[in-house]
């Protein structure tokens, strides 16, 4: 007798899977979930999944370093773009800031704060530098670390700025892409997965931020407190965050 086909995993199955059962193939092309009173889909990234993805990205960076031993175009410096690039940047630092291979240079990490978008897919009239570049990039091969590349605006702006500071080759490093956009000043892109353009990614650094921004939006579109709670549960929010923030945000947000 034929064995029954295994049941396809649902969105919530993937979100709640324990660390040792992380499905790497799913997270290369993940799908979000629909909720009431919103046109966007939402994709909740658990902490351990964020760590897993950064590890896979670090492996790609290491492979890039090995492939460029002879070209002398190995990455020696990396710029984390705040705020989004801080979490993946710190996770990458754990893998790449030192090395046991004498042919692979350790990467020096720094930061730069840039605001390019007012909201998802909504670029500002002019990008703003919020925090100055913290490391010297003159004549260096530089990795630019972001959490997500949407239209490519931030990455392109930062790459152009770094080149104005004397940087050589620019390599974009990001866990997720929505598109490569019009990236004119970047030689190579290292990433892990693609997400659809209609999907709002909720990384571990912005769980509360997303909740306090989206709950009032749902409320103003007719959602009750109960509907907002159902939305958050459907997205994958843990009960402790819902208990702390939902009612206060709904009533005063």
Residue ranges of predicted features:
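PRPP-associated nucleotide enzymes
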Residues: 1-253
């Amino acid at each position: 007798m034929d064995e029954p086909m295994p049941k396809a995993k649902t969105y919530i199955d993937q979100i709640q899977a324990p660390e040792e059962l992380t499905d790497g193939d799913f997270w290369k092309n993940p799908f979000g979930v629909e909720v009431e009173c919103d046109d966007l889909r939402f994709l909740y990234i658990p902490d351990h999944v964020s760590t897993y993805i950064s590890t896979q990205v670090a492996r790609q960076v290491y492979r890039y370093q090995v492939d460029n031993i002879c070209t002398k175009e190995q990455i020696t410096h990396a710029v984390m773009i705040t705020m989004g690039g801080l979490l993946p940047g710190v996770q990458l630092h754990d893998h790449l800031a030192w090395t046991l291979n004498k042919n692979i240079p350790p990467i020096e990490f720094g930061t730069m704060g840039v605001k390019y978008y007012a909201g998802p897919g909504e670029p500002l009239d002019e990008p703003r530098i919020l925090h100055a570049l913290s490391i010297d990039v003159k004549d260096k091969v530089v990795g630019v670390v972001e959490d997500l590349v949407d239209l490519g605006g931030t990455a392109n702006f930062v790459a152009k700025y770094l080149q104005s500071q004397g940087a050589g080759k620019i390599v974009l490093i990001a866990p997720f892409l929505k598109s490569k956009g019009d990236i004119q000043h970047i030689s190579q892109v290292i990433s892990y997965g693609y997400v659809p353009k209609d999907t709002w990614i909720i990384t571990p650094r912005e769980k509360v931020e997303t909740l306090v921004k989206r709950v009032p939006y749902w409320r103003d579109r007719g959602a009750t407190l109960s509907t907002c709670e159902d939305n958050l549960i459907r997205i994958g929010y843990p009960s402790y965050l819902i208990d702390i923030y939902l009612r206060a945000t709904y009533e005063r947000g």
